[in-house]
Amino acid sequence: MSGRSPKAPRAPSSTRAGGLVVAAHGRHYLVAPDDGGAMLQCFPRGKRSEVAVGDHVIYELASADQGVIVEIGERRNLLYRSDQYKSKLFAANLDQLLIVLATEPHFSEDLLGRALVAAEANGLKPLIVLNKTDVTDELEGARKRLEPYRALGYTVVEVSIRTQPEAARAALIERLHGHSTLLLGQSGMGKSTLVNLLIPDAEVATREISTALNSGRHTTTFTRLYPLPDSADGTGGSLIDSPGFQEFGLHHLTEGRLERAFPEFRPLLPNCRFYNCHHLHEPGCAILEAVADGRIRRERHALYAQLVHEASQIVR
């Protein structure tokens, strides 16, 4: 999928202007104007906040450095954080999901599986990065755990950010140019180190964004977008860093979207006896037959069943 952004709304008058939402904290948003001017702190109009990092918006100037968001451009996709009680959008207009894992500490396959489902459900290309390959005692075990995901067609890139930073950067940067990529990773996997490797002034930018959003000490609690340095052919791209891998939610997905977010399920779906099969205990279910004979891993089906259960519990 191309990294080209959806068409942004057009500002109809001189009192309005367009821009890109590059950071969010609560109802505070930082917008980079399309004309290249200084970034503005913006607020949504009304009580509801329906703005996400990566949105193209129209804002009205309220002062020299503040604005009110009055319109949101057409979105290519939208990702949420969800729990049983609420669902909050946080990133829009993505085309890749980069998941940082490591040989140590032990990474969670449940969280990896959920991230892959989110990518599939939103039309994103997943990219798995296995960091800390220099920890050789754990390397083969990590490779073995990732082999089933390679078999499903997912790309796994092995790096050692600490011991071979330039090789790691070279292995990843060309995969990121021209794309809008969301970066996810559990604590200890090396995600922050990777951001600083790919975005040389990331720490300075984070401090500036924190100040602009008045988020003070909460510097790790906001989602932010970093423009990538241009490649040799002039294509840039962006990297969106978001905290809280554990909060990455899928409860808002319908059962139909969930079943199609498992690539190994898709070819078998037409073979179920019942058109409205839930793939949990129905007779003649092609998915359950594939689980029984080993074509589909039991762990993957268990994740699907858990996600269906969680989706049924959400308060809508």
Swiss-Prot record:
Annotated GTP binding sites? N131, K132, T133, D134, G185, Q186, S187, G188, M189, G190, K191, S192, T193
Gene Ontology cellular component terms for the protein in this record: cytoplasm
Q: Which Pfam families match?
A: RsgA_GTPase
* Residue span(s) of domain CP-type G: 83-248
Q: How is the cofactor bound?
A: Binds 1 zinc ion per subunit.
Which compartments does it reside in? Cytoplasm
> Could you tell me the Gene Ontology terms of the biological process aspect for this record?
ribosomal small subunit biogenesis
| Domain of life of the source | Bacteria
Its EC number is 3.6.1.-
Stored SUPFAM superfamilies: Nucleic acid-binding proteins, P-loop containing nucleoside triphosphate hydrolases
Q: What general EC class does the enzyme of this chain belong to?
A: hydrolase
Q: What is this protein called?
A: Small ribosomal subunit biogenesis GTPase RsgA
Q: Which gene encodes it?
A: rsgA
